[in-house]
Amino acid sequence: MESSAKRKMDPDNPDEGPSSKVPRPETPVTKATTFLQTMLRKEVNSQLSLGDPLFPELAEESLKTFERVTEDCNENPEKDVLAELGDILAQAVNHAGIDSSSTGPTLTTHSCSVSSAPLNKPTPTSVAVTNTPLPGASATPELSPRKKPRKTTRPFKVIIKPPVPPAPIMLPLIKQEDIKPEPDFTIQYRNKIIDTAGCIVISDSEEEQGEEVETRGATASSPSTGSGTPRVTSPTHPLSQMNHPPLPDPLGRPDEDSSSSSSSCSSASDSESESEEMKCSSGGGASVTSSHHGRGGFGGAASSSLLSCGHQSSGGASTGPRKKKSKRISELDNEKVRNIMKDKNTPFCTPNVQTRRGRVKIDEVSRMFRNTNRSLEYKNLPFTIPSMHQVLDEAIKACKTMQVNNKGIQIIYTRNHEVKSEVDAVRCRLGTMCNLALSTPFLMEHTMPVTHPPEVAQRTADACNEGVKAAWSLKELHTHQLCPRSSDYRNMIIHAATPVDLLGALNLCLPLMQKFPKQVMVRIFSTNQGGFMLPIYETAAKAYAVGQFEQPTETPPEDLDTLSLAIEAAIQDLRNKSQ
């Protein structure tokens, strides 16, 4: 059983024995390996000592060189191994792990050559065996082509090293200045080449398809090294395939005409001055060569896109991030009648009057309606302000009818900073109340005043007396060719669903009128029976009217207190009578 379990001898691989317990047969290669290790053991010990007292010193006579061993091969007991020194010795060197690149004379045989080139894997030194002997190769020191060692009596040095891995290929260091961008990394803005290494394009919209900035095939100029601005790495994809928003104007000018009363060209007087003739600059946007696909213009997408550029080498002023204006949602200033008339190419006449500071007379009122972006500015409200008692009395009369759907509160105030702060605080409190419809502050636009002649007034009165058909057929349209003007005071309306909410809103608004008697005005206005701003308030309005005729389901706390006092008084009277 044991003999069948043992491994058999492999004739192709004699180094492998039949079993780990059975000694392996000696082959010429193993004999040569044992001989080399025995010969080098003393050399290794002598190399380790190096004068160290811990290691015993070996006499030089006991050491033999390889040349001397070959000369005394007849006296050596291993002469049968040296006779076959050719191929066997080369294989023994490989098995012993000897590196031929070590110091000392190189072992060169007649029938073998050792190669120490690095391989892909860390394997021992490969041996290339050749059948033809190398010319001029000899193992004796006299015929060796290399230089003789200084001490021939000393044995040659053989250092056993592990295989050396292949050295990495060292590439030359490339400077950052030597890296040039591709030719299509260039943007032209106002006839200037912008270096894209200092630009970051950020977009959060998917509607910017077709908005591209044309790129030129020129090499981008590198920014100056002394500017102190960091370089930003350009994106990997070319800029010609990216969508860009319009570049902002370096002067920060708006894209469209601004007719807001809070514009920069404002005055502190109640009427106009000579400087009002100048129009506010409505400068156009940046001039960028663009290619349009599908939509026209840069303002086609309703999104916010930012273009943040670093300082350029030309020294141009940089602007901060700016929102791109939407085309679908326009600002309130663009909804003014004056701007709409300009868009429709309506011609405006310029009155032949002199503009000056001061109050406007009735016969010179036409100079107020010249073509300008200025608003009519007022420190105080230009009309008669009713008293608080009149406003409150009219509100109470409306509340007695139990329906206030045809009533509303109008607040008019100037744009003084202190007044605006107080009004905003009241608006914040109104927003927390129930059953209210609040408007945002808005402006009023005014047209040219005209006094109608008596015949026009007579025709209108007759049409009203005749009835609805005559009034419908009346055609009295009196026009003008002057530019409408807007006043700078703000307006706001409040619509309440029930009398409870109307009186509650008045309690918040009337203190403003009391604090600013010339800058804030509160009115009660009437409308037709059109209903509420939204139908959701109809249930609350009907419940208020019905609730006045229903009996309360619970006894008020005042009645309970009165009843308890009466019971206590009756009990006290009974006690007094019993005594």
From Swiss-Prot:
UniProt-annotated stretches for the region Non-covalent SUMO1 binding region (SIM): 200-208
Basic and acidic residues: compositionally biased ranges: 1-11
Modified residues (Phosphoserine): 203, 205
Residue ranges annotated as motif SUMO-interacting motif 1/SIM2: 409-412
InterPro entries: Cytomega_IE1/IE2, Herpes_IE2_3
Molecular function per GO: DNA binding; metal ion binding
Residue numbers covered by motif SUMO-interacting motif 1/SIM1: 199-202
Subunit structure, interactors included: Interacts with host SUMO-modified form of TATA-binding protein (TBP)-associated factor 12/TAF12 in a SIM-dependent manner; this interaction increases the transactivation activity of IE2. Interacts with host CHAF1A. Interacts with several components of the host transcriptional machinery including TBP, TF2B and CREB1. Interacts with host DNA replication licensing factor MCM3. Interacts with host PLSCR1; this interaction inhibits IE2 transactivating activity.
Function: Stimulates viral early and late gene expression and thus play a crucial role in the regulation of productive infection. Selectively drives host RNA Pol II transcription initiation at a subset of viral early-late and late promoters without substantially affecting Pol II transcription of expressed host genes. Mechanistically, forms a repressive complex at the major immediate-early promoter region involving direct association with host nucleosomes and TBP. Concerning activation, stimulates transcription by binding nearby, but not within, core promoter regions.
Protein name: Viral transcription factor IE2
